[in-house]
């Protein structure tokens, strides 16, 4: 079976469409999604529509946690918008009650067994969805991440692609679909073959010019939202 590993979509439907087109061409059977479907950018409804066509497993990210808190706390929502832009507010406005409830009820972490492989899907680390596991993690942290006797651990949150191997465990961060931070343009994901146990970190080019302009119009006070999409 071929699995697409992806996450940190952040309401960027253009980037997600590019990844899903590539996944279709690669004959992917199933998506494993590390959370943060919403936040930062402005098309959460389209993101959910695109994902609805696929067999998928999804875990909660920190932006889904923000979404849940923002639904009942206007002051917290205002704080989120000041720091991260209007992505969470737009999700509350665009999505129906069922969609919002499902996003806010996503699990973390999620244990799966696929083709005889034990897989752990998480957002930050296996023990904390808001813990950052960067590519330069030290050996002690690497051992802790791989201590659960899994064949594959998939995580997100940092927006940096990473691939490590310790013993029989593959530890992978596919990078961010919607907002990569490693100064290479494009939408990041990974392709995993359960039969051969091979993994490929991939990046798909897409036209982000309309989204960049939208960021500049909506949030001139937050230049980061557009600048991060243009880093090289």
Pin down the residues of each PLM region:
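Core catalytic region of metal-dependent phosphoesterases/phosphodiesterases
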Residues: 2-97, 104
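Active-site environment of divalent metal-dependent phosphoester hydrolases
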Residues: 10-15, 39-42, 63-69, 129, ...
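Active-site-proximal segments of metal-dependent phosphoesterases and phosphodiesterases across multiple
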Residues: 78-82, 115-148, 180
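Short Pro/Gly-enriched beta-strand edge/turn motifs at strand-loop
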Residues: 92-95, 99, 145, 170-177
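Active-site-proximal beta-strand elements of phosphoester/diester hydrolases
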Residues: 2-10, 118-125, 171-175
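Anionic-ligand binding region
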Residues: 135-164, 169-172
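Short acidic-hydrophobic surface loop/beta-edge motif
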Residues: 108-116, 164-166
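Acidic, His/Gly-rich catalytic cores of divalent-metal-dependent hydrolytic chemistry
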Residues: 165-232
């Amino acid at each position: 079976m071929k699995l697409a590993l992806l996450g940190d979509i952040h309401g960027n439907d253009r980037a997600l469409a590019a990844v899903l087109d590539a996944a279709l061409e690669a004959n992917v059977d199933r998506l494993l999604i590390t959370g943060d479907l919403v936040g930062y950018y402005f098309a959460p409804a389209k993101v959910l529509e695109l994902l609805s066509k696929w067999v998928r497993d999804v875990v909660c990210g920190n932006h889904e946690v923000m979404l849940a808190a923002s639904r009942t706390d206007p002051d917290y929502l205002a704080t989120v918008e000041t720091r991260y832009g209007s992505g969470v507010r737009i999700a509350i406005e665009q999505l129906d009650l069922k969609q919002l409830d499902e996003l806010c009820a996503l699990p973390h972490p999620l244990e799966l067994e696929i083709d005889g492989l034990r897989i752990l899907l998480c957002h930050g680390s296996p023990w904390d969805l808001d813990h950052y596991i960067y590519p330069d993690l030290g050996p002690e942290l690497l051992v802790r991440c791989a201590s659960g006797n899994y064949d594959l651990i998939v995580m997100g949150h940092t927006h940096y692609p990473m691939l490590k191997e310790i013993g029989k465990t593959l530890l992978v961060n596919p990078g961010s679909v919607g907002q990569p931070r490693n100064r290479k343009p494009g939408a990041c994901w990974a392709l995993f073959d359960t039969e051969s146990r091979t993994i490929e970190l991939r990046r798909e080019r897409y036209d982000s010019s309309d989204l960049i302009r939208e960021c500049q119009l909506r949030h001139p006070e937050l230049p980061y939202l557009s600048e991060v999409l243009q880093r090289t």
